[in-house]
């Protein structure tokens, strides 16, 4: 009965998204891409998957232009799915865009603080984080006007009202603002998928809980590691941790008290995956690519490498389930990683860094 009712409203969307998932690049595609000698060769390899979107690129395009066109495909497909979604699935997809909105608003706040023309910043905003009233924010000439506009004109208003004031919006606090908004967003999203009548007790709640708990844990760990050597107090740091996840509450309490990498490692020992990440990365590892991507296995990977790899594995497994909105979230994450992979390979080709070209993450 659950499947019957799901397919009445959402069967078409599920079919479309599974088709998008089947068009993702495979390890064979990546192997062929790493053999390319130029960006134009790479364009040819990407032709079957991205042809229509790459057609307008000039010869010898920049890697940033290539990345923008591959992002355009994700945006186009996402908007098509969203246009055909209805009811709780439409609201679910709106939640997916809030993370991008947070990044866009943080960018506009930073630009306003530096007295930049915020209209120029609109071009740098992520298209999935665009909302109808975003141009209104560009009318603001100072941080107070921007804050008042955000409080009224954006879907993020509830996340601001609950914990941020005008005094928080300064250059030193911008990352704290971003992380506070993300904390409120993740908690709201987690509550939504576990309490909405269409999702509570369904595969959507089960799979999305795993995905969001992983994201909450990753952010808590990264916030802790990035706070070392800064003026952020332990009490303020603790306020940035989402109040759910595999580490919550004991692990996050230990994270809030950690003074060094060893303290973080001890805090995550209760979760086998995270413990193995720290052991393999040697307490943090080093960067290996944009987003700190890494190749196969765990050898030579940074901590963030392994978080990305784990996220891809969870997202891949989401497609083994039926009758769930979670495949939309998983598909977006998988496509984002594909874009990072393409950009990384293109950068290595452009800079003639072939020895590092295999540092990408492929799960298919």
Curated annotation (Swiss-Prot):
InterPro entries: ATPase_csu/dsu_sf, ATPase_V0-cplx_csu/dsu, ATPase_V0-cplx_dsu, V-type_ATPase_csu/dsu, V-type_ATPase_csu/dsu_dom_3
Annotated keywords: Hydrogen ion transport, Ion transport, Membrane, Transport, Vacuole
GO function terms (MF aspect): proton-transporting ATPase activity, rotational mechanism
Disulfide bonds: none
Transmembrane segments: none
A Pfam family: vATP-synt_AC39
Membrane topology: Peripheral membrane protein
Superkingdom field: Eukaryota
GO biological process: vacuolar acidification; vacuolar transport
Compartments where found: Vacuole membrane
GO CC list: fungal-type vacuole membrane; vacuolar proton-transporting V-type ATPase complex; vacuolar proton-transporting V-type ATPase, V0 domain
UniProt function note: Subunit of the V0 complex of vacuolar(H+)-ATPase (V-ATPase), a multisubunit enzyme composed of a peripheral complex (V1) that hydrolyzes ATP and a membrane integral complex (V0) that translocates protons. V-ATPase is responsible for acidifying and maintaining the pH of intracellular compartments. This subunit is a non-integral membrane component of the membrane pore domain and is required for proper assembly of the V0 sector. Might be involved in the regulated assembly of V1 subunits onto the membrane sector or alternatively may prevent the passage of protons through V0 pores.
Subunit structure: V-ATPase is a heteromultimeric enzyme composed of a peripheral catalytic V1 complex (components A to H) attached to an integral membrane V0 proton pore complex (components: a, c, c', c'', d, e, f and VOA1).
Family named by the database record: Belongs to the V-ATPase V0D/AC39 subunit family.
Name of this chain's protein: V-type proton ATPase subunit d
Organism field: Neurospora crassa (strain ATCC 24698 / 74-OR23-1A / CBS 708.71 / DSM 1257 / FGSC 987)
């Amino acid at each position: 009965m659950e499947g019957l009712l799901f397919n009445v409203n959402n069967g078409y969307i599920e079919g479309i998204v599974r088709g998008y998932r089947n068009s993702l690049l495979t390890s064979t595609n990546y192997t062929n891409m790493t053999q390319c000698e130029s960006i134009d060769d790479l364009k040819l390899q990407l032709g079957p998957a991205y042809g229509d979107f790459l057609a307008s690129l000039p010869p010898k395009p920049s890697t940033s232009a290539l990345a923008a066109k591959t992002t355009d495909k994700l945006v186009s497909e996402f908007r098509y799915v969203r246009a055909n979604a209805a009811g709780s699935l439409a609201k679910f997809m709106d939640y997916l865009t809030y993370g991008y909105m947070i990044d866009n608003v943080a960018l506009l706040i930073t630009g306003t603080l530096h007295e930049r023309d915020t209209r120029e910043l609109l071009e740098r905003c992520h298209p999935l984080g665009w909302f109808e009233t975003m141009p209104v924010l560009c009318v603001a000439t100072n941080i107070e006007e921007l804050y008042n506009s955000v409080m009224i004109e954006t879907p993020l208003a509830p996340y601001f009202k609950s914990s941020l004031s005008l005094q928080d919006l300064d250059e030193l606090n911008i990352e704290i603002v971003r992380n506070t908004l993300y904390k409120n967003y993740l908690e709201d999203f987690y509550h939504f998928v576990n309490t909405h009548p269409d999702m509570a007790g369904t595969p959507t709640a089960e799979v999305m809980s795993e995905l969001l708990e992983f994201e909450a844990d990753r952010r808590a760990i990264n916030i802790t590691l990035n706070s070392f050597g800064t003026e952020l107090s332990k009490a303020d740091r603790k306020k940035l941790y989402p109040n759910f996840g595999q580490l919550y509450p004991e692990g996050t309490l230990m994270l809030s008290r950690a003074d060094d990498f060893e303290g973080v490692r001890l805090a995550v020992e209760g979760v086998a995956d995270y413990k193995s990440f720290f052991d393999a990365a040697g307490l943090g590892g080093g960067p290996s690519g944009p987003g700190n991507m890494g190749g196969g296995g765990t050898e030579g990977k940074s901590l963030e490498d392994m978080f990305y790899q784990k996220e891809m594995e969870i997202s891949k497994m989401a497609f083994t389930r039926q009758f769930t909105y979670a495949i939309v979230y998983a598909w977006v994450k998988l496509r984002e990683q594909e874009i990072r992979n393409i950009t990384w390979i293109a950068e290595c080709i452009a800079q003639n860094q072939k020895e590092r070209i295999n540092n990408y993450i492929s799960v298919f």
